Amino acid sequence: CCIAVQAQTSSKNYLLEKQMLDVSDNQIQSISDKAGSLLYDGSFDFKDGASESTEYFYNANGALTKDLNKGISKIEYDVLDNLSCITFNNGFKTKYVYDAGGSKLKTIHEALTTNTTDYIGDFIFEDGKLSKYQFEGGYCSFDSHLNPTYHYYEKDHLGSIRMVVNENGTIEQVNHYYPFGGVYGDLGYNSELQRNKYIGKEFDHTSGWDWYDHGARMYDAAKGSWD
């Protein structure tokens, strides 16, 4: 199987992806990317980090347990098959905590420092401090004195967030997407402002994880597959 994606800057076209996929029993076993790596700031392309006959490993339920291309040595799940821990080759970890219904309560990123995100209803806390309140059509952020600032989404027909503007109408973020949900690097603006992106889902860019959280499953837009 082959996937080719052509991309464009203001001055020229270039080959973003040319992936050769080895698929067995409807599971991707390995990917070889024939396109060169991109150097554009914030570029979103498949990183071909391995050259093995088997680069993706799965458990009996079909859930991904190891990804050699992303440098992930182990992926663990809880008894309800919720993603619970990702361990990278460098020892960094990302952990998730859920309630009994499977809703995400907490994300923990363990790297050179440890950062936490807590989800309490529509409120989000970063490292124990109130960060934002999410509402339909946008969110409210808070400074250190809990003074609010309102931000509003401009969405496309898929519900993907194309633009974020503040309460004064100032553009704060611009997002453009490839067909499978990858984010343009050079044509976007301030992509780290907030994490909700393609079809409104939260995008986790930490440690090169680069997955969209759809609740029941994670989506990898770089290879267009559910994991």
Predicted features and spans:
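Coil-to-beta-strand transition motifs
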Residues: 209, 223-225
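A motif-centric feature for acidic-aromatic and gly/ser/thr-rich catalytic loops and repeats
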Residues: 131, 143-216
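Short, cationic motifs built from Arg/Lys/His that form the positively charged side of catalytic pockets
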Residues: 82, 103-104, 215-217, 225
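Acidic/glycine-rich beta-solenoid
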Residues: 1-151, 168, 187-197
